[in-house]
Amino acid sequence: MAYAYLFKYIIIGDTGVGKSCLLLQFTDKRFQPVHDLTMGVEFGARMITIDGKQIKLQIWDTAGQESFRSITRSYYRGAAGALLVYDITRRDTFNHLTTWLEDARQHSNSNMVIMLIGNKSDLESRREVKKEEGEAFAREHGLIFMETSAKTASNVEEAFINTAKEIYEKIQEGVFDINNEANGIKIGPQHAATNASHGGNQGGQQAGGGCC
């Protein structure tokens, strides 16, 4: 399917926070309770619609283990968006956010949009990190914030789409150089065939998709 833009994402965070499950829920709309550890990097893709334009999201799911950190770093450079994930039932994953964020900002382009995600919101009885703590961390570091559940699909769609909306807004504002693919944005065939509009940011519903 033709698209106006392709946005590259990277999903980062500690092992076991649900990165692969979030990707699977977004691309395939299913939950896999037992998931093998990601070894290196896995990949998924889906089409969405923003402001009447088809946007292809190309999403790289990275391993959380320290031994794979150098591989993860190489994917920061070509990403327009990052989903930084922690597990609300494991405080250590929240405590490690600063390290992940420093790594991301050191190795990515300065305009990369970062969405902070507190995953496993369905496990409220086991919560160790308050929602207010996530909100405060996001405010302090200039991030977008949502709590999600890869199991129930709560806010999963919104997390990926809202990140794309932020990227799209930056394109409209001229913040991103869309002719430089190192920024994680590629102009698609649909954009070339039509005049780019500079209207408001509307929509964001799925237009179909699948896992690649």
Curated annotation (Swiss-Prot):
Record text on activity regulation: Regulated by guanine nucleotide exchange factors (GEFs) which promote the exchange of bound GDP for free GTP, GTPase activating proteins (GAPs) which increase the GTP hydrolysis activity, and GDP dissociation inhibitors (GDIs) which inhibit the dissociation of the nucleotide from the GTPase.
Motif stretch (Switch 1): 37-42
Binding-site list for GTP: 16-21, 38, 64, 119-120, 122, 150-151
Enzyme's top EC category: hydrolase
E.C. code: 3.6.5.2
Residue ranges of the region described as Disordered: 190-212
Signal peptide: none
NCBIfam families reported in the protein's UniProt record: small_GTP
PANTHER family linked to this entry: DRAB11-RELATED
Record comment regarding domains: Switch I, switch II and the interswitch regions are characteristic of Rab GTPases and mediate the interactions with Rab downstream effectors. The switch regions undergo conformational changes upon nucleotide binding which drives interaction with specific sets of effector proteins, with most effectors only binding to GTP-bound Rab.
Protein name: Ras-related protein Rab-2A
Lineage: Eukaryota, Metazoa, Chordata, Craniata, Vertebrata
